[in-house]
Amino acid sequence: MSGRFGRFGGQYVPETVMNALIELEREFEKAKQDKDFMEEYRYYLREYSGRPTPLYYAENLTKKLGGAKIYLKREDLNHTGAHKINNVLGQILLAKRMNKKRVIAETGAGQHGVATATAAAMFGMECEIFMGEEDIKRQSLNVFRMKLLGAKVTPVKSGTGTLKDAVNEAIRDWVTNINDTFYVIGSVVGPHPYPTMVRDFQRVIGDEAKEQILQKEGRLPDYVIACVGGGSNAMGIFYPFIEDKEVKLIGVEAAGEGIETGKHAAAMAKGSVGVLHGMMTYLLQDEEGRIMPVYSISAGLDYPGVGPEHAFLKESNRAQYVYATDEEALAAFMDLSQTEGIIPALESAHALAYAMKLAPNLTKDNIIIVNLSGRGDKDVNTVAKVLGVEL
């Protein structure tokens, strides 16, 4: 594995971390070739997380929009309510294989933290989750959930108290406790081999979706659309379609209050190339290379960078990256809830918002797959607040 996607990716880390990354890459490569390991991974995806997830034809929404057929890849139906568990099960099985006793993770929306705490509980491992102080306030429900699952939740006060700061803190902990600790990264970010490893554990989404659409429609979709924060749900559904040039891949970033306001998280639209968290990629940074504060209504999208493979897909024109505002995501959130009886995560609602713009301009013969990366239970408080409803 080269660890590079074109010029992106790499391992921009201190010496202290290098040995751990080399060990991790070696063990991951071995595990991937090991039939027993992959069999065990698939067993837990099936029996514990409930895969395969359905590819659901959103008939009401399709009729309402009057254009392309919209299918939803129902990652919201996974155990713990999002795609995160696909990756966590893989990494924690790897940690077990490497005889690590403790796992740590960063979390923004709390979904990755919950998934990590969940799997750690099942495999009987000690678990500590680092979470920005601001995110802790926004996601109190998920914080309590992690504690219920036996994890220790450590607030991160430095910087803006959000995801980027939680990652920094997790890396610091990992360096200190490298011998017995496994760092479970939650997205296709960080130094090599993480972006590749997370993608490989998430590609089950796209592998299933491809098989399912061929069964249902006898052909591949015209568009595959997914939201992009760090970008693991998107990379997971995109990857199996990359060689199918006729399938357009569209990543949707968070435009927050608007792309020109400075209150957004659209690293592809407004960022420049730099280095963060051990990787070279597109980042929201100032002239001096300082990371700028990011914002989105959805805590899971407010990451100031994007996975390096996405940066490469953009630069090589294989995928297109667009954005949706808070307002558009909220409208899509309400629409899906009321037309299909499915409450989506605010993250996924960004992808849906773009699909809902696109569909009416296409014909009834066109097919769109939207990755519904998570369910919206965690966001009900946020939405109520925006609507001025006291809970």
From Swiss-Prot:
Enzyme's top EC category: lyase
Catalytic activity: (1S,2R)-1-C-(indol-3-yl)glycerol 3-phosphate + L-serine = D-glyceraldehyde 3-phosphate + L-tryptophan + H2O
GO molecular function: tryptophan synthase activity
PROSITE patterns, per the entry: TRP_SYNTHASE_BETA (PS00168)
SUPFAM superfamilies for this protein: Tryptophan synthase beta subunit-like PLP-dependent enzymes (SSF53686)
Amino-acid biosynthesis is among the record's keywords: yes
N6-(pyridoxal phosphate)lysine modification, residue list: K84
GO cellular component: cytoplasm
Keywords, comma-separated and alphabetical: Amino-acid biosynthesis, Aromatic amino acid biosynthesis, Lyase, Pyridoxal phosphate, Tryptophan biosynthesis
Pathway membership, UniProt: Amino-acid biosynthesis; L-tryptophan biosynthesis; L-tryptophan from chorismate: step 5/5
Subunit structure as annotated in this protein's UniProt entry: Tetramer of two alpha and two beta chains.
Protein name: Tryptophan synthase beta chain
Protein species of origin: Thermoanaerobacter sp. (strain X514)
